UniProtKB/Swiss-Prot annotation:
Source organism of the structure: Xenopus tropicalis (Western clawed frog)
Active site (UniProt): C84, C87
Gene behind this protein: prxl2a
Span list, region Thioredoxin fold: 13-111
SUPFAM superfamilies per UniProt: Thioredoxin-like (SSF52833)
Subcellular location: Cytoplasm
Entry protein name: Peroxiredoxin-like 2A
């Protein structure tokens, strides 16, 4: 026969196990809401246009970011990490719009926050546009948002992993990849930011239809200014 104390201990351990399991499930469920995500602070045109960018190549030169969109507007991708296979997938998706953007006269650019080894060179085949260095990471701000261990328990992240993997995209672990990226459609002159997409989790891509719709507004605005 079991001693009463043994039964009480067994019941206590069972209760603790059930409680721990319930807490774990509750934690995972909460992690898949937006409750613990860093709040996004929207960028302003004044904030972005004075950003110092550098060309990447044999003769790197510095210039103000507003030079990218002042005349014709621009679509600008803020790449989280060039070696990330999710970022390569998003770059490929955006590049699929290149011919339509060309018809609108709207250029496609990307910025990276670091230039390590040949990472940008290896990223270039996925992105049909020029890539520049934003050393201060202003396109990732004003409030830089990070995703760390939370990303490992979010269902959306694993779905994004699966989607990119099935698409045949590969990558590496080189460079900083915790600061989340984004995408901007910026109008010509002082027209402003027409679309701002902030990556809320790894692999959270901008809606391509929304990108084109915003780019079409640039084209119309420029045509009105020319008349």
């Amino acid at each position: 026969m079991f001693d009463l104390s043994d039964q009480l201990i067994a019941m206590g351990l069972w209760s603790i196990s059930i409680g721990a399991f319930g807490a774990a499930v509750a934690g995972i469920l909460l992690a898949n809401t937006d409750l613990f995500l860093t709040q996004t602070e929207e960028a302003t045109l004044d904030y972005l246009e004075e950003t110092e960018l550098k060309a990447i190549g044999d003769e790197p030169k510095s210039f103000k970011a507003k030079d990218l969109w002042e005349k014709n507007g621009a679509v600008v991708m803020a790449v989280r990490r060039p070696g990330c296979f999710l970022c390569r997938e998003e770059a490929s998706d955006l590049s699929s719009l290149k011919s339509q953007l060309d018809q609108l006269g709207v250029p496609l650019y990307a910025v990276v926050k670091e230039n390590i080894g040949n990472e940008v060179e290896q990223f270039q085949p996925y992105f049909n546009g020029k890539i520049f260095l934003d050393e201060k990471g202003k396109f990732y701000g004003p409030q830089k948002r990070k995703m760390m261990f939370l990303g490992l328990v979010r269902l959306g992240v694993w779905q994004n992993f699966r989607r990119a993997w099935k698409g045949g995209f590969e990558g590496n672990l080189e460079g900083e990849g915790l600061i989340l990226g984004g995408m901007f459609v910026i109008g010509s002159g002082k027209q402003g930011i027409l679309l701002e997409h902030r990556e809320k989790e790894f692999g959270d891509k901008a809606n391509l239809t929304a990108v084109l719709d915003a780019a079409r507004k640039i084209n119309k605005q420029r045509a009105q200014n020319d008349n």
